[in-house]
């Protein structure tokens, strides 16, 4: 990208706009959680055993081998026990609390499934891709929060990422099961898999937030996963200031009024400070 196309990196100018904003949308992606040590399972080195996320995070993979897929997600859930919200998550949560006290509005729309925003204290969080800590019953369709560790006894000690530590598959009858009355249906992770559509109700709410905001922040996202990749450019098209915070420029950077390069955990505490 040539310099003439680069947006402003003037933090003082951004903060003047921030102080006047009444409704702020903060779009977050994997770059925010990466600073907490959360693996993305995308790109080089993003393997679990010998599988990529594209091999396991699909409806067909779950139909053919639910035990293997549950081991993968059990590993990811258990791995989160050692992870904590970082300075970026905390800065966003503190900003939301401060704005709420002043009668202003902040909404976090995240592509992440790790609930680190909520653990930091964010309240208005829309999870575009679901959550590692929610389940959905294939039989009754009930969605439930679930922070059990392990999620079921049969998965205790399972899910090692090492291809040398593969034990016997857990029988389907012992995988996580629905506890709603007498349902007993097989549970799946409540996450959006490859080849699945995003939840229409979540998209509708996101659209409402994006259409009513007067400032938008794009934080730690490569802006390549659709439909989220189009959210901020569409906000910019209606003349609303958009600021991107990322380690590098993206395919969408030229749409935005501001771009700040660097770790989100360093940039956001400065950008969102009182």
UniProtKB/Swiss-Prot annotation:
It comes from the Eukaryota. One of its GO terms (molecular function) is protein-succinyllysine desuccinylase activity. It is found in: Mitochondrion. Substrate binds at residues 73, 76. GO terms for cellular component: cytosol; mitochondrial matrix; mitochondrion; nucleus. It catalyses: N(6)-malonyl-L-lysyl-[protein] + NAD(+) + H2O = 2''-O-malonyl-ADP-D-ribose + nicotinamide + L-lysyl-[protein]; N(6)-succinyl-L-lysyl-[protein] + NAD(+) + H2O = 2''-O-succinyl-ADP-D-ribose + nicotinamide + L-lysyl-[protein]; N(6)-glutaryl-L-lysyl-[protein] + NAD(+) + H2O = 2''-O-glutaryl-ADP-D-ribose + nicotinamide + L-lysyl-[protein]. Zn(2+) binds at residues 137, 140, 178, 183. Residues 4-274 form the Deacetylase sirtuin-type domain. Keywords: Metal-binding, Mitochondrion, NAD, Transferase, Zinc. Its cofactor is Zn(2+). Its EC number is 2.3.1.-. The active site is at 129 (proton acceptor). NAD(+) binds at residues 29-48, 111-114, 220-222, 246-248, 264. The keyword Magnesium does not apply. Belongs to the sirtuin family. Class III subfamily. NAD-dependent lysine demalonylase, desuccinylase and deglutarylase that specifically removes malonyl, succinyl and glutaryl groups on target proteins. Has weak NAD-dependent protein deacetylase activity; however this activity may not be physiologically relevant in vivo. This protein may be expected to contain an N-terminal transit peptide but none has been predicted. In contrast to class I sirtuins, class III sirtuins have only weak deacetylase activity. Difference in substrate specificity is probably due to a larger hydrophobic pocket with 2 residues (Tyr-73 and Arg-76) that bind to malonylated and succinylated substrates and define the specificity. This is NAD-dependent protein deacylase. It comes from Daphnia pulex (Water flea).
């Amino acid at each position: 990208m040539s310099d003439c196309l680069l947006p402003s990196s003037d933090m003082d100018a951004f903060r003047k706009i921030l102080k006047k904003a009444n409704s702020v949308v903060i779009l977050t992606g994997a770059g925010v959680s990466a600073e907490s040590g959360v693996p993305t399972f995308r790109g080089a080195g993003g393997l679990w055993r010998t599988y990529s996320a594209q091999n396991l995070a699909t409806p067909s993979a779950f139909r053919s081998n639910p035990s293997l897929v549950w081991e993968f997600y059990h590993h990811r859930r258990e791995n989160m026990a050692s992870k904590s919200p970082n300075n970026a998550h905390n800065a966003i949560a503190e900003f939301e609390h401060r704005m709420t006290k002043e009668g202003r509005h902040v909404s976090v729309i995240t592509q992440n499934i790790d609930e680190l925003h909520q653990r930091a204290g964010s309240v208005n969080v829309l999870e575009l891709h679901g959550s590692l800590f929610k389940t959905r019953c294939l039989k009754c369709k009930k969605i439930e929060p679930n922070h059990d560790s392990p999620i079921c006894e049969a998965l205790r000690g399972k899910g090692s990422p090492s291809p040398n530590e593969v034990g016997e598959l857990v029988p389907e009858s012992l995988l996580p099961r629905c506890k709603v009355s007498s349902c007993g249906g097989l549970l799946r992770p409540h996450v959006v898999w490859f080849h699945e559509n995003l939840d229409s109700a979540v998209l509708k709410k996101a659209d409402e937030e994006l259409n009513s905001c007067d400032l938008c922040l794009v934080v730690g996202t490569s802006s390549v996963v659709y439909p989220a990749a189009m959210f901020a450019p569409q906000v910019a098209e209606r003349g609303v200031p958009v600021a991107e915070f990322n380690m590098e420029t993206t395919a969408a950077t030229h749409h935005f009024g501001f771009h700040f390069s660097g770790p989100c955990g360093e940039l956001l505490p400065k950008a969102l400070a009182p």
